[in-house]
Design a protein with these regions (language model features):
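Alpha/beta enzyme core
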Residues: 6-9, 14-16, 40, 56-75, ...
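Short beta-alpha connecting loops at secondary-structure transitions
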Residues: 103, 142-145, 217-219, 247, ...
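Catalytic alpha/beta core domains of metabolic enzymes, predominantly
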Residues: 224-359
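A mid-to-C-terminal "edge-of-domain" accessory segment
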Residues: 2-46, 301-493, 528-531
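Mixed-charge, glycine-accented linear interaction segment located at domain edges/termini
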Residues: 544-546, 550-571
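Short, small-residue-enriched loops and turns at beta-alpha junctions
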Residues: 47, 51-52, 81-85, 139-141, ...
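A conserved regulatory-domain signal marking ACT and ACT-like small-molecule sensing domains
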Residues: 467-477, 486-488, 493-546, 552-553
C-alpha cells in the first residue's frame, strides 16, 4: 500500500522558533527510577485562585484549605497577601483562629518590592512557621520588553529583595521563617543566568543543611518537551552552590499538555519538591495536577504520603472552591476514566476480574489484598473511593463482555458464554437503531422482554403454573405439570431421566419438538431462601434458542427456562 503523502499546511510556522536543546551529553536522569514521593506543596489557594474567573471567597478558601490539610499536604501556599485585602484577611484568619495544624507550614508569595514584602511579613505574624516565597522574572523576553533591564539589573532586584526578607525576619520573632526564591519564567531564562541569580540570592540568605532554602524552578510557561525541562533541572542541580543546603523545587505549567511528564522527569533529574494544584487548575492551561502525580505513584506501589482514598469528595470540594468542573476524562478523578465502552476492552476487563479472583483464591488471599492486574484499569477504583458501577457501560461499541459484566454485577446473572453472544446481539441491534448508551436498568428491561415474561409484562404462548414430581433412586422421574397454553390450563404427565428430560418428553407428546442441549444454573444470592437462575440451550424444531428461568426452586427454574426457550422460538 502506498500511503498518501502529507502536504504542507497553511499554519504560519515561520513566526516561531524551535527551543534550543541543552548540552548535557552525560545526563543521568533517563536511567533513574522514582522510588519515593517528593516533598509536595499545594498552590491551589494562590496560583490556582488567581486564575479563577470568580476568585474564592472565604468559605470556599476554607473548604479548600481544610481539604488539603485532611489529605496530608504539609506545605500549602495560602495566598498572595500583598496583592489583595481578601488574601491578606484569609492568611490572618487561619492564623488567628488557629486553623493551621502544628505540622503544616503555610507559604505566602510576594514580588520583589519592599512595600509588598513588608505587607507579606505583616500577614504571617503569629504563625508558628511560614515560607516566604519571593520571585522576580528573569527571562530574556521579560528583561527586554517588560523591565528594560540587563542581567545585572534583574539580579539586583532579586538580591535587594532577599536582603529585605532577611532583615524582616526579626519582625516576626514567634515565627520560624523559611525562604523560597523563584526565577519566574525560568524556562525562558538562560541556564547560566538562572543559576547565577539563584546563587546570588543564596549568598544573601546563607542556607545551611539545618535551615535550607527552596530554589523553585518554574515552567511559568511550558516551552519545550519534558526531557528538555529535565535536562535543565539536572544541570541546575549540578551547578547550584551549597546544594546540600538547597531544596530544588519544580513548578510546572501545562501549556504544551505535558506538565505531569515534566514534573516526573524533573524529579528524576534531581529535584526534591513539586508545587502544583488539585486537578491542575491554574493560569492558562493550568498547573501540574497533584492528583495525577500522586496516584501515579500509587500505581507503582509507592506511598504518595497523600490520602486519595475518597477521590469523589476531593473532586466535589475542588469543584465547589474553584467553581470549575473537573473534566470527565481527567486522570483518576473524571467521571469516565474507569469506564469502558469498547467491546474488546469490556471483555478483557471481565476476564481480568474473573482471573484475579482465581489467583487470589489460589494464593489464599482476599481479592482486595491481591496484586492488582486488570486490563485497561491501572488502579483499582475501590482504592480511591470509586466503585465498579461505571467501569463497564453499554453503547453501540460494546460487546458481549460488557453486557455480561453488567448482567453479573448489576443483576447477579452469570450468563453462559453462548447466551452472552446471543443477548449481546439484541443489545447491539437496539443501540444501532436508537443510539446512545444503555443503562443497567435498560439492560434488565431488554433482558426481561427477551427471556423473562413477568406478571406486569406477560408474553409467550406457554406458562408454567405448577408441577409435582416423584422419583426413586435409579429410576426415571415422574413429572406432572400444569401448563397454560394460550390461556387454557392443561394437566400433563410424563417421565424421563431428570425433571428437564421428563418435561421435554411431555412437550414432545404435546406436539412441541424440544431437546435440551446444554444447562447451567447458579444461586442468585447466598442463604437458604436464595433464588436460582437456570439457563438452558434448547433445540426447538431444529433451531437453537436459549431460555432463562428464575425461581426459588431449582427444578422449577429449569422448567421455566425450557418454556422461555420455546416461547422465544414461536414468538
Amino acid at each position: 500500500m502506498n500511503f498518501p503523502k502529507q502536504v504542507p499546511s497553511k499554519m504560519p510556522v515561520h513566526r516561531y522558533e524551535a527551543f534550543h536543546p541543552i548540552d548535557l551529553p552525560d545526563r543521568t536522569w533517563p536511567n533513574k527510577k522514582i522510588t519515593k514521593a517528593p516533598q509536595w506543596c499545594s498552590v491551589d489557594l494562590r496560583d490556582g485562585n488567581q486564575a479563577l474567573i470568580d476568585p474564592m471567597d472565604t468559605p470556599r478558601k476554607l473548604a479548600m484549605f481544610k481539604l488539603l490539610v485532611a489529605m496530608g499536604y504539609k506545605e500549602i501556599e495560602v495566598g498572595f497577601p500583598s496583592a489583595s485585602q481578601t488574601d491578606f484577611d484569609f492568611v490572618r484568619k487561619i492564623i488567628e483562629e488557629k486553623l493551621i495544624p502544628d505540622d503544616v507550614v503555610i507559604q505566602v508569595l510576594t514580588q520583589a518590592r519592599e512595600a509588598l514584602i513588608v505587607r507579606t511579613f505583616e500577614s504571617i505574624k503569629g504563625s508558628k512557621q511560614a515560607i516566604v516565597h519571593l520571585y522576580n522574572s528573569t527571562s530574556t523576553l521579560q528583561r527586554r520588553v517588560v523591565f528594560g533591564l540587563d542581567k545585572d539589573g534583574i539580579k539586583k532586584i532579586a538580591t535587594d529583595a532577599a536582603k529585605i526578607c532577611l532583615d524582616l525576619v526579626k519582625t516576626v520573632p514567634e515565627t520560624k521563617v523559611s525562604f523560597e526564591y523563584s526565577p519566574e519564567s525560568y524556562t525562558g531564562t538562560e541556564l547560566e543566568f538562572a543559576v547565577e541569580v539563584c546563587n546570588a540570592v543564596n549568598d544573601v540568605w546563607k542556607p545551611t543543611p539545618q535551615w535550607k532554602t527552596i530554589m523553585n524552578l518554574p515552567a511559568t510557561v511550558e516551552m519545550a518537551t519534558p526531557n528538555v525541562y529535565a535536562d535543565s533541572i539536572e544541570w541546575m542541580c549540578r551547578n547550584l552552590n551549597n546544594r546540600e543546603s538547597v531544596i530544588v523545587s519544580l513548578h510546572p505549567h501545562n501549556d504544551r499538555g505535558t506538565g505531569v511528564a515534566a514534573a516526573e522527569l524533573g524529579y528524576l533529574a534531581g529535584a526534591d519538591r513539586i508545587e502544583g494544584t488539585l486537578f491542575g487548575n491554574g493560569e492558562r492551561t493550568g498547573n501540574v495536577c497533584l492528583v495525577t502525580l500522586g496516584i501515579n505513584l500509587v500505581t507503582h506501589g509507592i506511598d504518595p504520603h497523600i490520602d486519595f482514598s475518597n477521590i469523589d469528595e476531593v473532586r466535589r470540594t475542588v469543584e465547589y472552591a474553584n467553581q470549575l468542573r473537573v473534566p470527565e476524562r481527567h486522570p483518576y478523578g473524571g467521571d469516565l476514566v474507569f469506564t469502558a465502552f469498547s467491546g474488546s476492552h469490556q471483555d478483557a476487563i471481565k476476564k481480568g476480574f474473573d482471573h484475579m479472583a482465581v489467583d487470589a483464591k489460589a494464593a489464599g488471599k482476599e481479592v482486595r489484598d491481591h496484586t492488582w492486574a486488570i486490563p485497561y484499569l491501572p488502579i483499582d477504583p475501590l482504592d480511591i473511593g470509586r466503585s465498579y458501577e461505571a467501569v463497564i457501560r453499554v453503547n453501540s461499541q460494546s460487546g458481549k463482555g460488557g453486557v455480561a459484566y453488567l448482567m453479573k454485577n448489576e443483576h447477579h446473572l452469570d450468563l453462559p458464554r453462548r447466551l452472552q453472544i446471543e443477548f449481546s446481539k439484541n443489545i447491539q441491534a437496539k443501540t444501532d437503531s436508537e443510539g446512545g448508551e444503555i443503562s443497567p436498568e435498560d439492560l434488565w428491561n431488554i433482558f426481561e422482554d427477551e427471556y423473562l415474561p413477568t406478571e406486569g409484562a406477560p408474553w409467550g404462548r406457554f406458562r408454567l403454573k405448577g408441577l409435582s414430581q416423584t422419583s426413586v433412586l435409579g429410576e426415571d422421574v415422574h413429572l406432572i405439570v400444569s401448563l397454560t397454553d394460550r390461556g387454557q390450563v392443561h394437566e400433563l404427565k410424563g417421565q424421563g431421566n431428570g425433571p428437564s428430560a421428563a418435561f421435554c418428553n411431555i412437550l414432545q407428546n404435546y406436539g412441541v419438538d424440544v431437546r435440551v442441549l446444554d444447562y447451567y444454573e447458579h444461586a442468585l444470592s447466598a442463604g437458604g431462601d436464595a433464588s436460582a437462575a437456570a439457563y438452558l440451550e434448547c433445540s426447538i424444531e431444529g433451531e437453537t434458542f436459549w431460555g432463562v428461568g428464575i425461581d426459588p426452586n431449582t427444578t422449577t427454574a429449569s422448567l421455566k427456562a425450557v418454556v422461555s426457550a420455546i416461547n422465544r422460538a414461536i414468538r
